[in-house]
Regions:
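Class I S-adenosyl-L-methionine-dependent methyltransferase module
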Residues: 1-35, 47-50, 136-140
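Generic beta-strand/beta-sheet core signal
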Residues: 36, 58-60, 88
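Short, glycine-/Ser/Thr-/acidic-enriched flexible segments
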Residues: 38-40, 62-64, 92
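A short SAM/SAH-binding and catalytic strip from SAM-dependent methyltransferases
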Residues: 55-68
Length: 140
């Protein structure tokens, strides 16, 4: 916990309060953690969800660590699953999302793109500190 607290930037007491609150929740109800190949494991987990559930697969700053081929495979995998796909990745990380941006990725240094089901909705700060919606409605 002390290490995590050290990662909160000075002068941000609200973030420190949120971190401590989140840690308290996590300690009370620890998350299930699964390991394995991203593409295979995500498919298994989505398939295991109750049929009546709306499954949301969310990732942030994950796909940049995969090869381009693995990213393309992930997109094919996720689009074939009965789920909503919410991503928060660097502007050029998901090629099909980058192709839909209102300005080239090179014009948005340090920004991430929030996308729902592969449709970009807005630019976000890399640590979630800002969110600027595009003109179209973020909800569909």
């Amino acid at each position: 916990m002390r290490w995590l607290e050290c990662l909160v930037w000075p002068g941000q007491p609200e973030r420190l309060r949120r971190l401590r609150g989140a840690v308290a929740i996590a300690r009370a109800r620890p998350a299930d953690v699964f390991s394995g190949d991203l593409n295979e494991t995500v498919a298994e987990l989505v398939d295991a969800a109750p049929e009546e559930a709306t499954v949301v697969v969310f990732h942030s700053a994950v796909l940049a660590y995969l090869s381009v081929e693995e990213r393309v495979r992930f997109e094919r995998t996720i689009r074939g699953l009965p789920c909503r796909w919410l991503s928060n990745e660097g502007c050029g990380v998901i090629g099909s999302v980058a192709d839909q941006l209102p300005m080239p990725a090179k014009d948005t240094p340090g920004r991430f793109v929030v996308a729902l089901d592969g449709v970009p909705l807005g630019y976000a700060g890399a640590h979630g500190q800002t969110l600027d919606w595009f003109r179209r409605s973020p909800i569909r």
